[in-house]
Each structure stands twice: as structure tokens, then as C-alpha cells.
């Protein structure tokens, strides 16, 4: 995980300090800024990607409701569209990339590290399946089935 921008200023037209203040007032376990804004390779249609981790005890409906509320609230803190995701609902490779390269907005480093270890283990366990799917896709492309 990339270290947070300690001065709390903006990253590519994102008011990181304001987003941190807002998220600190919620019950998210942690939040990460990730994607093109962190990598520094934005273009005019780039959005602002934020992954949230909610408490485990929340129902799927409550997680959805809270994510939508936070998503709406954060729109004013960036020039582009803010795309807020529940990290538990992200595809495994994207969640892993957010944990590897993202910037911590709020949350405890130990909790983020523990979740990262869990995602890494799951990623390794499913490597053969991903490789099989990739090869099948390439074969279908070569045959003109896609």
C-alpha cells in the first residue's frame, strides 16, 4: 500500500483531506483511494476510485445503502466523478490492486494489512482458475467465437 499523502492536499483534483474528514465520521473499517488518480495516469474521463470496507455485521442491504450515501456525499470533493465501491464486492484482482497500490484514506494499518493478507491468499488459491479462464478466452478469440 502506498503511504498516505500526509499534507492532506489534493491528488489530481481530489480534495483528499476533505474526503478523509468525511470518511472519519462514518463507520467504515477502512477506505482506500486507488486507480488512475493514484498511479498518475489520468485522462479527461478518469473517475476517482475509492474502496470502502464496512463492518462485517452489516447486511448486504445496509452496506449498499451506506455505500450509496457516502458515494453521493463525496461527489463534491473532486472535479471528476467519484466511484465508491464496497471492496468486498470488487473482483479479486481489483481489490488486490487497491490494497497493493492504493492510498489509505482512513482506517487502521493493521486491519488493512490483515485484510490484504486474506485477499492475497484467496488470489493465490484461485490463480489456476484465472489462468484456465484466460486460456479459454484466448482460444475462443482465436476460433472467432467472440
Per-segment meaning from a language model:
Residues 35, 40-60:
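Catalytic metal-binding acidic patch
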Residues 1-26, 30, 39, 57, ...:
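Catalytic core of pol beta-like nucleotidyltransferases
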Amino acid at each position: 500500500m502506498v503511504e498516505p499523502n500526509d499534507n492532506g492536499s489534493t491528488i489530481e483534483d481530489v480534495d483528499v483531506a476533505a474526503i478523509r474528514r468525511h470518511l472519519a465520521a462514518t463507520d467504515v473499517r477502512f477506505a482506500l483511494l486507488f486507480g488512475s488518480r493514484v498511479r498518475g495516469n489520468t485522462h479527461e474521463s478518469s473517475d476517482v476510485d475509492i474502496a470502502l470496507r464496512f463492518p462485517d455485521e452489516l447486511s448486504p442491504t445496509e452496506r449498499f445503502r451506506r455505500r450509496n450515501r457516502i458515494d453521493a456525499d463525496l461527489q463534491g470533493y473532486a472535479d471528476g466523478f467519484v466511484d465508491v465501491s464496497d471492496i468486498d464486492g470488487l473482483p479479486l484482482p481489483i481489490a488486490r490492486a487497491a490494497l497493493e497500490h492504493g492510498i489509505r484514506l482512513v482506517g487502521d494499518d493493521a486491519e488493512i494489512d490483515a485484510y490484504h493478507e486474506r485477499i492475497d491468499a484467496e488470489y493465490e488459491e484461485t490463480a489456476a482458475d484465472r489462468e484456465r479462464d484466460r486460456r479459454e478466452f484466448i482460444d475462443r478469440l482465436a476460433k472467432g467465437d467472440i
